[in-house]
């Protein structure tokens, strides 16, 4: 939701206002920064803020997926004609009403694409929860699957059974 609004503002603003192209490239350049570079500062920052739990991981996922989602939404908005917005403005709709009643429903295919890509990425992510979440009681499913592997051996029967069960919700 936040990413679609940001993509709308940046996508429509790039044609009209000069500085929006810089903002767009600044946000999209975040896709080129690997998590391994950001890992240690994020651990320190989340610990200082006291969000080394599920909430902190959710906030980080919102931030990490913003560049890709803004890229997708702003690219999709180039295919939606501005005449739709102009017609809504002539009918007396505000910019906010135009977005929610005209543009947002037209972006349903992109909402589905963003939801699928984000869900797959967060479901399969091991590193972010492993580094950020403190305490043994807070585990995601991929973190719980790490318990089947140890330094001295692996319980393959239980490990592969858990992998199959973890695959079912994604299908």
Residue ranges and their predicted role:
Residues 1-171:
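A structural signal for multi-pass alpha-helical bundles of membrane permease subunits
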């Amino acid at each position: 939701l936040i990413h679609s609004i940001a993509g709308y503002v940046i996508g429509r603003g790039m044609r009209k206002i000069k500085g929006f192209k810089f903002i767009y490239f600044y946000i999209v350049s975040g896709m080129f920064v690997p998590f391994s570079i950001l890992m240690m500062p994020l651990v320190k920052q989340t610990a200082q803020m006291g969000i080394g739990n599920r909430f902190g991981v959710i906030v980080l996922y919102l931030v990490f997926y913003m560049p890709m989602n803004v890229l997708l939404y702003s690219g999709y908005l180039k295919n939606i004609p501005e005449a739709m917005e102009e017609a809504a403005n002539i009918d007396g709709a505000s910019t906010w009403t135009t977005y929610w009643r005209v543009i947002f429903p037209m972006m349903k295919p992109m909402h589905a694409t963003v939801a699928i890509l984000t869900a797959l990425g967060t479901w399969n992510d091991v590193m972010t929860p492993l580094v950020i979440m403190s305490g043994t009681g807070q585990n995601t499913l991929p973190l719980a699957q790490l318990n089947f592997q140890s330094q001295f051996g692996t319980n393959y029967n239980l490990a592969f059974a858990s992998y199959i069960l973890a695959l079912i919700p994604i299908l």
